Regions:
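Membrane-interface "cap" regions at the ends of multi-pass membrane proteins
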Residues: 1-30, 58-63, 67-79, 85-89, ...
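Inter-helical loop and helix-membrane interface segments of multi-pass membrane transporters/permeases
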Residues: 2-5, 34-38, 68-90, 103-162, ...
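Membrane-embedded translocation segments of transport machinery
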Residues: 2-8, 12, 170-259
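Transmembrane helix-boundary motif of multi-pass solute transporters/channels
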Residues: 10-48, 234-243, 252-254, 258
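Hydrophobic alpha-helical transmembrane segments of multi-pass membrane proteins
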Residues: 16-22, 48-53, 90-101, 148-155, ...
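Extracellular loop-to-transmembrane helix junctions
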Residues: 35-61, 87, 141-142
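Hydrophobic alpha-helical membrane-insertion segments
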Residues: 50-56, 90-111, 175-185, 259
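Central hydrophobic cores of alpha-helical transmembrane segments in multi-pass inner-membrane proteins
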Residues: 51-63, 67, 73-74, 149-158, ...
Length: 259
């Protein structure tokens, strides 16, 4: 039986929203450093193994639960077992905590973009080096851009699943892909780029020499996997609740982590 509430208007729209949930600042900023600090290619190997044997299964399970119940995280677990709503509340709580710092970073990015554009079209350079110091010293500005970022999110969510989140994701995700390719090309042309690539990708298997260091890498890779794929916070359950019964969950579950 199809859900009576709204649904994704297309599988492409769902994929863009789900990939957008997975590809965030945690990957752009955090993942490269975690790779380099935890054995480079050795960390990547552990991460890929976890995604293949754990991430795919958890994501498929969450999407299945969401589509089957047609409810958000709390309601879905309550539908499975009346004693399990606390699992959904924990997921919502973790998402709320993540929003706490993502909204601040989002406001900072908006302020940086505004400063860059104003100075670029004004013919002046933008002093990126001093930006962060001036940013944290300007509390009213921080609060203002934080509020603006939250307001934009509220407007998008109020548009509904297809008219808001899906429509925005169809534009934002291709734009993000173009920006990432631009950044990759730009970074590759910078002095010291090769040293950075070596730091990230050259495997250092000495991290597996002791049980403690191995579990440190495993813990870091597992945390990155759950964070990167938006697992355990109810996002995929909620997205799955708006999926049509005709969509192929297995294929979607493969596409999202790979993207």
């Amino acid at each position: 039986m199809e859900n009576n509430k709204g649904q994704w208007s297309s599988n492409f729209g769902f994929l863009m929203a789900a990939i957008g949930s997975a590809v965030g600042l945690g990957n752009i900023w955090g993942f490269p450093y975690k790779m380099g600090a935890n054995g480079g290619g050795a960390f990547l190997l552990v991460y890929v193994i976890l995604v293949v044997f754990v991430g795919f299964a958890v994501m498929l399970g969450e999407l299945t639960i969401g589509r089957k119940t047609g409810k958000g995280a709390v309601g879905a677990y309550r539908a499975l077992n009346k004693k399990l709503p606390w699992v959904g509340y924990m997921g919502v709580g973790s998402a709320f905590l993540i929003l706490g710092f993502y909204s601040v970073l989002g406001g900072m990015v908006m302020r940086y973009m505004l400063g860059f554009l104003v100075n670029m079209f004004g013919g002046a350079g933008f002093a990126a080096e001093g930006f962060f110091g001036s940013w944290i010293a300007n509390m009213p500005g921080m609060v203002g851009f934080y509020a603006l970022f939250m307001l934009l999110n509220i407007v998008i969510v109020m548009g509904g699943i297809s008219g808001g989140i899906e429509k925005f994701s169809k534009v934002a995700m291709p734009a993000l892909a173009v920006m990432l390719v631009t950044v990759i090309v730009y970074v590759a042309c910078q002095p010291g780029a090769m040293e950075g690539y070596k730091f990230m990708f050259v495997p250092d298997f000495s991290v597996f020499d002791s049980l403690k260091s191995f579990f440190d890498v495993l813990k870091s890779a597992a945390g990155q996997m759950f964070f990167s794929l938006s697992l355990g916070m109810g996002a995929m359950i909620t997205y799955g609740s708006y999926l049509s019964k005709s969509e192929d969950l297995n294929t979607n579950t493969i596409i999202i982590p790979v993207a």
